[in-house]
Amino acid sequence: MIKKGIRIVNSKIVYYVFAALIFVTVFCLLGERGYLLWKDSPAYLAFDGRTGIVPIYPLFLQINRMIFGEELFLYAVIVEQTILTVICILAFTEFIRKRFRLSYLASYPVLLFSVFMPFTTNYPLSISNHDIMTEALAYPIFYLYMICFLKFIFDKKYKDLVIMVLVSVILALIRTQLQLVGVFNAAAFFYVSWMKGRKYPLGRQIMQAVLYVFLSAMVLLVGEIMILGANSAGQRLIAAMNKETEVKEMVMAEEGEPEAETMDEPETETNSIEQVEVQPETASVKVAETSGSNMTEQYGHLIIDKAVYEIDEDDYLLFEEEELQKLCMKIYQEADEERQRYVYARNDLWMWQDIMNGIGSGTSIIGAAWNEYLAENPDTGLTYSAINQIAVVLLKEHLGRVIYHTLRMLPQGFICTVFFQKEGVYLLCHLITLVIYVSAIVLAVWGYRRKDLNNQYPEFLLGCIVINICFVLIQSIMYFAMQRYLVYCFGIFYVAYYLTLKEVFNRFWHGRKKGRIKFGFWMVSQKKI
């Protein structure tokens, strides 16, 4: 009876029916039933090429607005996001199932891990496919990137590198922070080149390693050039579409017709938001005309935010010019009034939260301080660029503290990649995360040392470990380690962990038989995949 039940569950029809039920339940029934607007959503709806917002998602929203109209387009958006999410998850799980020759029974955990994270990060409030946020596209397309990434490191064919770089460019044009995927490309290239050259003597391998480092840097550089060029083209397209809309509105106004309503709602929503994630209150929202400018300018804003968090009362003495001293004092006063300075951070495991909130408030603090300074000094010769000058000086002065606070954000960043954070047992969350990562590294080393195990298992797991480490380090240093920035590889990591752990279980508890490993109905061929 039990064997018959297992055979039924192991059938193709049951597996895909189960997958359909999971997709409908998670992406249609859980969380917000309609669309959900977040604090940053108006910035994407505004369609004005502002700082830090790359073109794909605003274009995606605008095209839907043009096709379906103001009242329906957001509903069309969530339908399309849902379809894309399902397609990308299916593509990834099918790639894994076929690549590792899994039975349908063995594929259920792969499906479940892939579905639930990162898409349920904000549950019960929402599931990502219902959010009007870049993650609604970035999360599923990252699964497509991982297919390309894994195929490249598994097959070690340089032609796969081209497709991988192209998909990484698409990701970077959805969300600025995903430029870091170029680092994954470079790491994968180095790994493949190193593994292909292991047949040579050690001395030659070392010499080649230097060349591989240089070529990896070239891969990173080429990808970045492609990203900046594509972003520039996208911003010009946004500017052209905006200009066309303005011309139509002027013509309609001259003809005595009511003004077009297509842009009213997002403008109203944008004005009702005091601060969005990537747009300073005082910064221009003019479409960038130069290559990648609205991407590179974002790093300047983040430097300012970190500098504001570290400011001290006597830092105005670092400047000789009186006007700069006045502005610096205004910034300090505003930051101190808002209690968004390092001195107000808790000195415990939750310190990262205060650091993140403080850095995230930098834009609004700067805006308020600048406005107060202008009100008191209307004849000043300073321009807003003086803020950058102050920020650079503050960062140099407090560099050690900046590094320390960055390090304090790292532990929670690693927790976000593989586990959850609960206040009552937060120390336990740290310990569990440490155990997960240490055990994953042990499994990867074990996999490489086993001559009878296909290298795909440890390569998959090690790749996920490296990706998570890069996510945490780069996001913490360049941005700040918010959970939704770090969970891209959450479910994929556990897929790799599960596959490798299953092989450990097979070998230590069931042995071998005629070139095949027997684990009930979990049959996995040990021939070259």
Short names for language-model regions:
Residues 231-410:
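Membrane-proximal stem/loop segments at transmembrane-domain junctions that anchor or position
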Residues 59, 69-90, 108-111, 427-431:
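Loop-to-helix entry region of an early transmembrane alpha helix in multi-pass inner-membrane enzymes
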Residues 75-84, 376-377, 381-469:
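Membrane-interface anchor segments at the N-terminal boundary of transmembrane helices
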Residues 30-45, 49-64, 68-72, 383-384, ...:
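Extracytoplasmic catalytic/substrate-binding loops of multi-pass membrane glycan-assembly enzymes
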Residues 55-58, 74, 78, 111-138, ...:
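Aromatic- and kink-enriched transmembrane "portal" helix at the membrane-lumen/periplasm boundary
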Residues 143-160:
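Membrane-interface transmembrane helices that cradle and orient dolichyl/undecaprenyl
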Residues 161-175, 212, 216-220:
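Membrane-interface alpha helices of multi-pass inner-membrane proteins
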Residues 79-103, 141-148, 439-442:
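Transmembrane-helix motifs of polytopic, lipid-linked glycan transferases
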